[in-house]
Each structure stands twice: as structure tokens, then as C-alpha cells.
Amino acid sequence: MKKLIMTLIVFLCTTSVYSQITAIHFNAAWNEPNKAEWVGELTDCEITYVDITASPKLQQKYNVVVVPTIIVLKDGEEIKRWQADLSFKIIATRKDIQNEIDEIIMSDF
């Protein structure tokens, strides 16, 4: 019974940490070939995709000036941002962004 309770406590603690982290992937329909498909493979965070042509208010709110842009938030506040270069391709890798997410999680312990 003690082991079950400890497992539940660990699960609840880690679930609450993960739910506080969000990765937002901004892109546009006209830039679909440069979409960072691997964003959906990120773990331990919520993932949101925003098409700036369909959601200009979100583009403005997050001050997105180039696509794709990936923003990692914790508790709604921006922690890190990766933006495309002049060719509209993002240079960051899935590993770069996952490492940042992992660091955010570890900083809470």
C-alpha cells in the first residue's frame, strides 16, 4: 500500500510540472514546406500549433515576426524562443528544444 501511495504522489507531482510547460509552434499555410514536423515529438509538455494567417491576434500577442517560430512557455511566461532564418527554416533541432524543456522540468526539483 505504501508503494502505491508513493507512486501516486510521484505521478501527481510530475504531472503538475509537465502541464505547466507549453511549446507553441507558429507557422503559416504558405510556409508549410518549412514546418517543423518534429515538434509533435516533444515530450513532457503541451504542444500547440498556430497558423498565423488564421490567428493574427496570437501572432501579435507573442510578437511573432518570422515563421516558423517555436516558443516554450512555463506558467504562461516565455522561457525561450527559436525563430527561422532568412530562408524561413528553423535551425533549432528537436533535441535543442527538448533539452530546454528538460532543464525547465529539472529546475523545479
Residues covered by each model-derived region:
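Soluble periplasmic/extracytoplasmic beta-strand elements of cell-envelope proteins
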Residues: A23-H25, T69-I71, R81
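Non-catalytic, surface beta->alpha helical segment in thiol-disulfide oxidoreductase systems
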Residues: V72-F109
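Structural micro-motif
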Residues: Y62-V72
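Sec-dependent N-terminal signal peptides
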Residues: L4-T14
